[in-house]
Amino acid sequence: MIRLLKKGEKEWWFWEAWYEEKEALYAVHVGTVGVKGGQYSVLTDQAAENNLQALQEWINEMKAEGYVGVTTEDLQPLHVQFFHLDAEDVETRYLIEQILDECLGMTGNGHCDGGDDSRGGLVFICRVLQIDQAVVDVRQALRETSFFEGVSLFTFHSDNSCIILT
């Protein structure tokens, strides 16, 4: 997946594209960061190797319009901890990861990097652009499930001091 951002006067816009081999199409997801974006598909009848070239040309067009690639420095860590869960329940772990990935991804605000159970409970590390909006979105997504109770969201300062966000 290719992910690009463009800074507006008051907000960031996102543009994401990837090739779906099975369907022989490009999926494109666009919108304002922090707001549910729109998605559309572009059909293609080209061979797979030409699809990468076509995607690169598309990326070049978007960059000419002011979009830039997302770097690790653009993303802030958001930790989502469930004290009452552990990694033994693999299905639950993957379900929560999917919920986090979906709620952050559909708003162009980030993604979930997976879970860790070394700190007590189960902790998911997400990488986000706008941490305040991500907290709102994650809390809302979890509120709609049975996983909301007992969740804690936090991040770290550059000096490794912990900041509790909920």
Where do the language-model regions lie?
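Short N-terminal "domain-start" leader segments
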Residues: 1-22, 83, 87-101
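Short aromatic-glycine-(Arg/Gly/Cys) micro-motifs in beta-strand/loop hairpins
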Residues: 16-40, 75, 98-117
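Short, conserved charged micro-motifs
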Residues: 50, 88-91, 130-137
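Short, intrinsically disordered low-complexity segments
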Residues: 108-141
